[in-house]
Curated annotation (Swiss-Prot):
InterPro entries: Snf7_fam
GO CC terms in record: cytosol; ESCRT III complex; late endosome membrane; multivesicular body
Role according to the record: Probable core component of the endosomal sorting required for transport complex III (ESCRT-III) which is involved in multivesicular bodies (MVBs) formation and sorting of endosomal cargo proteins into MVBs. MVBs contain intraluminal vesicles (ILVs) that are generated by invagination and scission from the limiting membrane of the endosome and mostly are delivered to lysosomes enabling degradation of membrane proteins, such as stimulated growth factor receptors, lysosomal enzymes and lipids. The MVB pathway appears to require the sequential function of ESCRT-O, -I,-II and -III complexes.
Predominant location category: cytoplasm
Gene that this sequence comes from: CHMP2B
Alphabetized UniProt keyword annotations: Acetylation, Coiled coil, Cytoplasm, Endosome, Membrane, Phosphoprotein, Protein transport, Transport
GO biological process: endosome transport via multivesicular body sorting pathway; late endosome to vacuole transport; protein transport
Bilayer topology: Peripheral membrane protein
Name of the protein in question: Charged multivesicular body protein 2b
Modification N-acetylalanine occurs at: A2
Segments carrying motif MIT-interacting motif: 201-211
Complex formation: Probable core component of the endosomal sorting required for transport complex III (ESCRT-III). ESCRT-III components are thought to multimerize to form a flat lattice on the perimeter membrane of the endosome. Several assembly forms of ESCRT-III may exist that interact and act sequentially. Interacts with CHMP2A. Interacts with VPS4A. Interacts with VPS4B; the interaction is direct.
Length: 213
């Protein structure tokens, strides 16, 4: 019951009009077919009257034929008009839909513009840029600190490599025995003796101190 009292939309009205126009078009086509049938019958009658020499009958039938052909011509004009109306209705419907879409879009844009504050948006972008710069600076400081730490570790490893190389040059192996070695003050010769040639006895004494047989 509710659908009976529902207000028709524009689409509903246009659909009804199109149905009526299609019905009118079919009726015009049927009328034209009937007129063409009558036209052929009149032509046959005129030929028949002409064969028997009945001029008066031929004249009357000829007038009817002229009137019928005029009526048939009118059906073509009316049919073209109906087709034009149907096309125009479709165009109007399309234009109304586009206008409705534009109206909806305009309302949406208006609502968005009301919600959006240009000053607030600009401030948000500036804050983002500021915080991003802070983050980049913090990251750079952390990277510099880590580089310093690891660079120091590399220096320590490099120093240890130099010590190992020097000990290796004088024929001392330190694999697992450096902890048992005497301190540098006792194991290393003085500045005056370091300049002299190290004797075999000195080397043997250092090896025994390191626990090397």
């Amino acid at each position: 019951m509710a659908s009976l009292f529902k207000k028709k939309t524009v689409d509903d009205v246009i659909k009804e009009q199109n149905r009526e126009l299609r019905g009118t078009q079919r009726a015009i086509i049927r009328d034209r077919a009937a007129l063409e049938k009558q036209e052929k019958q009149l032509e046959l009658e005129i030929k028949k009257m002409a064969k028997i020499g009945n001029k008066e009958a031929c004249r009357v039938l000829a007038k009817q034929l002229v009137h019928l052909r005029k009526q048939k011509t009118r059906t073509f004009a009316v049919s073209s008009k109906v087709t034009s109306m149907s096309t125009q209705t479709k165009v109007m419907n399309s234009q109304m839909k586009m206008a409705g879409a534009m109206s909806t879009t305009a309302k949406t844009m208006q609502a968005v513009n009301k919600k959006m504050d240009p000053q607030k948006t600009l401030q948000t972008m500036q804050n983002f840029q500021k915080e991003n710069m802070k983050m980049e600076m913090t990251e750079e400081m952390i990277n510099d600190t880590l580089d310093d730490i690891f660079d120091g570790s590399d220096d320590e490893e490099e120093s240890q490599d130099i010590v190992n190389q020097v000990l290796d040059e004088i024929g001392i192996e330190i694999s697992g025995k450096m902890a048992k070695a005497p301190s540098a003050a006792r194991s290393l010769p003085s500045a005056s003796t370091s300049k002299s040639t190290i004797s075999d006895e000195e080397i043997e004494r250092q090896l025994k101190a390191l626990g090397v047989d």
